[in-house]
Amino acid sequence: MAYSLEVAENLNKVFGKLAKKDKVTFEAINKKVKEILENPYHYKPLRAPLQNKREVHISGCFVLIFKIDEERKVVQLLEFDHHDRALK
């Protein structure tokens, strides 16, 4: 069963800017989100202090961090940033 999607408010702004300025990265994110919704447990779980979250790399050095709410069958997109900033 596929999961539904929730996007953090701060990501809506980031994705809006990417849709206008960097369509290649925006399309890469869309493709990866579709894959995540089909099988979210395929992607790397993070360690403390980011436990219960997972990451997927997009366009090399950028990561998308998400959380899975199994009870509601929802994937929550939390953060998209450069690897060094996102995992601090």
Predicted regions and their residues:
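A short, surface-exposed loop/turn module that caps and links secondary-structure elements
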Residues: 31-57
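Enriched for short, Lys/Arg-rich terminal
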Residues: 2-5, 16, 20-26, 58-63, ...
